[in-house]
């Protein structure tokens, strides 16, 4: 199991290790993550369509989380969002290299020509995040279920609470987005 931690450059948790041992990767859509981030840097309209749907944790790749955080900070501060401002914000945050550097940002903007379908793509990213969240919660519940000292009713409450958090967070974002349309 120690060897698996060294193989995957993406942050590894118990759920990821379990899935890798079973030959499964966690649900993800890296190509769509790249397309959404690239579109957000080339078209302001794309930012407006996505900013209420996604959060940094929705991205599977850590570099993408950092890039989205920088875009979100620029958006919150009412600053222009483009390749140069995102790069500058990442530098300011000390995360440019963690995000893949300037070359990676350029690659993201070159992979996409418009923000067409960005909302649809961001909803797929959100669905993959929800799937990963459910897998993580389920794995934690399974692990705790084997612990004889765990009170079963406390475990049920904990499971219900965690599932409710996933549901509420995503229903809220979906309804806010629907109202803005």
Language-model features: where?
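Interdomain "pre-motor" coupling segment immediately N-terminal to P-loop NTPase/helicase cores
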Residues: 110-181
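Noncatalytic partner-interaction/assembly domains of nucleic-acid and motor enzyme complexes
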Residues: 1-130
